[in-house]
From Swiss-Prot:
The lineage of its organism: Bacteria, Pseudomonadati, Pseudomonadota, Gammaproteobacteria, Pseudomonadales. One of its GO terms (cellular component) is cytoplasm. InterPro entries: Aldolase_TIM (IPR013785), His_biosynth (IPR006062), HisF (IPR004651), IGPS_HisA/HisF (IPR050064), RibuloseP-bd_barrel (IPR011060). Keywords: Amino-acid biosynthesis, Cytoplasm, Histidine biosynthesis, Lyase. GO terms for biological process: L-histidine biosynthetic process. It catalyses: 5-[(5-phospho-1-deoxy-D-ribulos-1-ylimino)methylamino]-1-(5-phospho-beta-D-ribosyl)imidazole-4-carboxamide + L-glutamine = D-erythro-1-(imidazol-4-yl)glycerol 3-phosphate + 5-amino-1-(5-phospho-beta-D-ribosyl)imidazole-4-carboxamide + L-glutamate + H(+). The active site is at residues 12, 131. Its EC number is 4.3.2.10. The keyword Amino-acid biosynthesis applies. Heterodimer of HisH and HisF. IGPS catalyzes the conversion of PRFAR and glutamine to IGP, AICAR and glutamate. The HisF subunit catalyzes the cyclization activity that produces IGP and AICAR from PRFAR using the ammonia provided by the HisH subunit. This is Imidazole glycerol phosphate synthase subunit HisF.
Length: 256
């Protein structure tokens, strides 16, 4: 039987508050990530991804406290990323209740960190987040490069080869964001999603660009992703998770 495809709402959190606005009805405090995560859990989301965009070091304790609160009230897998640079960072997040930890920039600067983390904690809880941008011109063979610092700094690393290297080092999952599409609401970059999904044997989560339910379905059908991640279409109440699952099922996709 085909593995069920996952739907994963994403929360961007700064100093313990959700920052990409949330306009759910019936939420007393739109900024509290725990309340929002509970809503998604009740709606039947498969997982929650929590990206800590707090730049300051002192924000870390707030983050751990938020993760602890979330883990005590939300009973679906929780992935936490943002500023993860050391084995101790990973241990702290897992101890706070995260199920998986996402590594982004630190993997670029020190790829062996991914191998060390996978060896220490198991591949099943190590996610590598990749921010990719298309660098090939019209008529050229499509090529995507890894960027860091929120898509501002090119690394010269080929995104497909890099993802393969991360898998070889022990990553259990790739969270792939297209920097070209992020926030544009006109769909995933299906080219890079498919290229990486087809090259790897581990799950790829497609992220960046969802504006409607067809975009979610296309990420799976055309992008070959194992899971699809979205923020604003769920946060603003445009669609609910059950609506997304029903739509994907209507397109022949196996959902939980």
């Amino acid at each position: 039987m085909a593995l069920a495809k996952r739907i994963i709402p994403c929360l961007d959190v700064d100093n313990g508050r959700v920052v990409k606005g949330v306009k759910f009805e019936n939420i007393r405090d739109a900024g509290d990530p725990v309340e929002i995560a509970r809503r998604y859990d009740e709606q039947g989301a498969d997982e929650i991804t929590f990206l800590d965009i707090t730049a300051s070091v002192d924000g870390r304790d707030t983050t751990l406290h938020t993760v602890e609160r979330m883990a005590s009230q939300v009973f679906i897998p929780l992935t936490v990323g943002g500023g993860v640079r050391t084995v101790q960072d990973i241990r702290n997040l897992l101890n706070a209740g995260a199920d998986k930890v996402s590594i982004n920039t630190a993997a670029v600067f020190n790829p062996e960190f991914v191998g060390e983390a996978a060896a220490r904690f198991g591949s099943q809880c190590i996610v590598v987040a990749i921010d990719a941008k298309k660098v090939s011109g019209p008529g050229e063979t499509p090529r995507w490069e890894i960027f860091t610092h929120g898509g501002r700094k090119p690394t010269g690393l080929d995104a497909v080869l890099w993802a393969k290297k991360m898998e070889d080092l022990g990553a259990g999952e790739i969270l792939l964001t297209s920097m070209d599409q992020d926030g544009m609401k006109n769909g995933f970059d299906l080219g890079v999603t498919r290229a990486i999904s087809d090259a790897l044997g581990i799950p790829v989560i497609a992220s960046g660009g969802v504006g409607n339910l067809e975009h979610l379905a296309a990420g799976v059908i055309e992008g070959h992703a194992s899971a699809v991640l979205a923020a604003s279409i769920f946060h603003f109440g445009e669609y609910t998770v059950p609506e997304a699952k029903a739509y994907m099922a209507s397109r022949g996709i196996v959902v939980r």
